[in-house]
Amino acid sequence: MMHRVGFNVIGRRSFFTVNARRQVLKSSFMGLKPLQLTALLLAGSAGYLYFMNARSAIHEYVVCPVVRLITPDPENGHKLGIWCFKWGLSPKLYFDKDPESLHVNVFGTTMTNPIGCAAGLDKDAEAIDGIMPTGFGYMEVGSVTPVAQPGNPRPRFFRLPADDAVINRYGFNSSGHDVVYNNLMKRVNKFLNSYFGDKSIDKLSLYKDKLLAVNLGKNKNGDEVKDYLKGVEKFQSLADVLVINVSSPNTPGLRDLQNEAKLTNLLSEIITKRDSQSNKPNALGKQNHKPPVLVKIAPDLTEPELQSIVEAAKKSKVDGIIVSNTTIQRPNTLKTQDETLRNQVGGLSGKPLKPFALKAMKAVSKYAKDSDLVLVGCGGISSGKDAIEFAKAGATFVQLYTSYAYVGPALIARIKDEVAEELKKEGKTWMEIIGEDNK
């Protein structure tokens, strides 16, 4: 009896509380004149549209700083960002059409623009349709390992705001092949079953002129060849591009795979595996699907070591090289004063990485000059000027991540605008400036 009375009392309180709130809201709006109500609705709609526009400065000056403020542990900020992208609480570039000067002819197709999202942002392929529409022409998910693994202990991700940089020692934390495969298959099935889907699209990004790559890693105690072969077998049917990550500084022994003999053997086995599966249809039913294979390398290599990597890429017949991953170096140009912070173990990315990545790109480009290898620039890119520097050094397209985390979605439109403006001044297209400094 007492329980019933208690329940009734609580129920009445809840009822009256809800009713009271409704009355307050009703009286508040009833007091407004039609013109005022219209103005309020228009202001709210305008605010929403402004927030949902990827060109809006609100993300750089309000949203991103607030996220950093409420998430002292950057890893939680990363998770919050992915959650927002996953559930559609993210802006998009509405009605934007990339100019032809930005188009990239690569891998037998055309990408709408040369700005790509690097691996590490969407590790488990959860948020592709939130991230891609902010303006990217290419997106890489992963790194993904065969078996789920937690990575290194936390904290393992550190912000260096004075340098627009971060240090991470994640250690290939991954939900594993099965989870990522299921996430990608759900996207494809939803697309195929959608009444409004453009069935003429033949790219696994599910966008007409954009590419989706899956970045493959190995487990901490996994086999240095078999783990990658498992990745090729699992994701060949779901990727426009496959990326072999042998350059993370946070997995013991991984960078040893950049040795010419080891790398040649690994990449040759991967190409053999890919070719043996090319007679199978991909997830969209396309026959003879043979995604290009890229290898991602470190910037912390000598010129002879970079030359050896290019030779390994040529011998194994992979399609290209991503230059580069994060650096283990700590340049004396860092503005961060906290010695403990700046000397955290892990890979440094963001603006301070650019000189190392660009130097490596120039060396790789020099030795890849007489080949068909596609070079991809990655490391410290945060402006149109940066993107053009990498292109002139030999990059067919570029990737970024850290600058996107600091500035927000508006960065992509800004970079594309800056590149298009500079190309117009020079009277050239993006394709015409690739490798210009090496000619």
From Swiss-Prot:
InterPro entries recorded: Aldolase_TIM (IPR013785), DHO_dehydrogenase (IPR050074), Dihydroorotate_DH_2 (IPR005719), Dihydroorotate_DH_cat (IPR005720), Dihydroorotate_DH_CS (IPR001295)
Catalysed transformations (reactions): (S)-dihydroorotate + a quinone = orotate + a quinol
One GO CC term, this protein: mitochondrial inner membrane
Subcellular compartments: Mitochondrion inner membrane
Gene Ontology BP annotations: 'de novo' pyrimidine nucleobase biosynthetic process; 'de novo' UMP biosynthetic process
The protein's required cofactors: FMN
Chief place where the protein resides: mitochondrion
EC code(s) of this entry: 1.3.5.2
Keywords: Flavoprotein, FMN, Membrane, Mitochondrion, Mitochondrion inner membrane, Oxidoreductase, Pyrimidine biosynthesis, Transit peptide, Transmembrane, Transmembrane helix
Residues that, per the record, bind FMN: 119-123, 143, 215, 245, 296, 324, 350, 380, 401-402
Positions annotated to bind substrate: 123, 168-172, 245-250, 325-326
Enzyme class: oxidoreductase
Stored Pfam families: DHO_dh
Residue stretch of the organelle transit peptide: 1-22
Entry keyword Electron transport: no
Cofactor note text: Binds 1 FMN per subunit.
Pathway: Pyrimidine metabolism; UMP biosynthesis via de novo pathway; orotate from (S)-dihydroorotate (quinone route): step 1/1
Annotated active site: 248
Gene3D superfamilies attached to this UniProt entry: Aldolase class I
Role summary: Catalyzes the conversion of dihydroorotate to orotate with quinone as electron acceptor.
Family: Belongs to the dihydroorotate dehydrogenase family. Type 2 subfamily.
Name this polypeptide is given: Dihydroorotate dehydrogenase (quinone), mitochondrial
UniProt source species: Candida glabrata (strain ATCC 2001 / BCRC 20586 / JCM 3761 / NBRC 0622 / NRRL Y-65 / CBS 138) (Yeast)
Native organism taxonomy: Eukaryota, Fungi, Dikarya, Ascomycota, Saccharomycotina
